[in-house]
């Protein structure tokens, strides 16, 4: 029995089949241990825990309860084959019934022990499987936890780096703000110091002015007191010779003072005369400038006239080119009617060239229209607000004529009319400046007469009145001079603006003439290329023309239509 139990503990296989010989040779101690299932369980797992012992005791109790009610004479049926083979030869019936009962009891105990071992083995296997599964789950959980720990550590490091960068940025911002605050505080302190310094300087200046005023008032009071005292002295000494002598001395002193004052007034009068001479020189210089401006305006008019002549020459050359193009077109239409029809590719190329020429013509018309609009704007700007009422009818008629025609077509002769009107306006402005110059010359003559009158009357009037009048005249002359300079400056600015506008108009006209010449050159090249292509085709296809003579009627129509398109294009130009 003990060997069987040791075999169960040592191996994980099924329990060996017990035999009757082994059961008979068991010692008494082993037999006593096998008789109780609890003792067998304790023998198998001597170091088991309390829960395992309780579970084994419950299972043995259940097995014992299931085997006790059975007939003691019957053999156990759990493993009939193994028990029948292991029992060996049955004892003779003549043996002692007690021995038989002991043997049967031992067999039952063996069966119970076998079942218990099998159950324990299965339970051990289940527990090993559960242990492996739990170990696997624990390993997976540990790996998952390690991954989460690694991920959390990495995120923590990233966040820590971000927060460190953010903290460094915030620290730099705080440092910059602190520096800015310090600079602002420094500026504020400097401004306060400057303000206090300015207030102190102003207060000191005010105090100095007050002191000067007080000193002047004191001097005036002293002088008045002296005058009063002198008058009292004169009254007191009027009856005596000494008083007459003192009076004579005082009169001599007054005469000396008046002579000094007279010299001063003469000096001031000479300065006033010099200023008058300077004003006269300024007026003469302004007259010279007006003459120069008139001469420049005349030069601009000559340039405008020359530009108009050049424009007429360009138009005449354009008309000659149109006539030449019409002749070439007619000649080409006649040649195309007699020759073979052009190919589809040449027709496409010619149509594309015609479209390009049409686009260039449209661009030229747009540029002419822009130049015409700009000249009209200059005319309206030169008219000014004073002549707005008189120009309403002209503008309305021009607007109606421009509205009836296309927005891109310049009316016939309208550009020349606008240029003539611009010239007329410039001439009217120059003529309007002549009365201003005349008025200035009249004022200068009046100033000269007044100067002569001042020279004549300077000897008769008192010096003080002469000085005051001279000062007033000088102020009036300065005011008039300033007004004249302001008017001349305005006229100069108007003349400069007119010159700049006229130069812009002339430049635009030159650009248009250059574009027209370039367009004429392009037209010459296109016509020459078309003629060369026609001659080359006539030379390269003499035989094909004879073979395709029957299709000449059909081929004439597109060439004639193309010639009509080209002729209409030059007719529009």
Curated annotation (Swiss-Prot):
Q: What biological-process terms (Gene Ontology) are attached?
A: Golgi to secretory granule transport; neuron projection development; vesicle transport along microtubule
Locations of Low complexity compositional bias? 387-396
Start-end of Basic and acidic residues biased regions: 68-77
Keyword Coiled coil, does the record have it? yes
Disordered: region residues:
67-97, 386-412
One GO term in the molecular function aspect is: small GTPase binding
Q: Which residues form a coiled coil?
A: 118-376, 440-525
Primary localisation category: cytoplasm
The record's subcellular location field reads: Cytoplasm, Cytoskeleton; Cytoplasm, Cytoskeleton, Microtubule organizing center, Centrosome
The UniProt keyword set, sorted, is:
Coiled coil, Cytoplasm, Cytoskeleton, Neurogenesis, Transport
Q: What does this protein do?
A: Acts as an adapter protein linking the dynein motor complex to various cargos and converts dynein from a non-processive to a highly processive motor in the presence of dynactin. Facilitates the interaction between dynein and dynactin and activates dynein processivity (the ability to move along a microtubule for a long distance without falling off the track). Predominantly recruits 2 dyneins, which increases both the force and speed of the microtubule motor. Component of secretory vesicle machinery in developing neurons that acts as a regulator of neurite outgrowth.
What is the designated name of this protein?
A: BICD family-like cargo adapter 1
